[in-house]
């Protein structure tokens, strides 16, 4: 198991996110002072597109660990974790603008948020026959998404 985690960790550090996925600014959020990426990865042999966000470490992105975050369910958007729990910005109840989250996990790690399964959050599932999900096909899609981005 440790070997697998080591390979995944090395792959995460050596991966170059597509420049087209780089986020340079967001409305109603403080300036971005770290690598922030948002994009899609296709699931092979389907029309599904899984949305991801990657918040690179604010400390040392080339040597800090990677955390892959999936909100519970399956069926709950991982953007809730990004926006209200441990992401680089937070939007508290009743607020209309994001604030910098001083306790963000990306202070010391590269955090990869996965919107799973397809059809949840910003993920796309245009063929409704592919949208029914259970633990097994969600796990398969999650693995494909992680392998595609790392």
Label for each model-derived stretch:
Residues 2-66:
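Catalytic-loop region of hydrolases
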Residues 49-140, 147:
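N-terminal cap/lid subdomain of alpha/beta-hydrolase-fold enzymes
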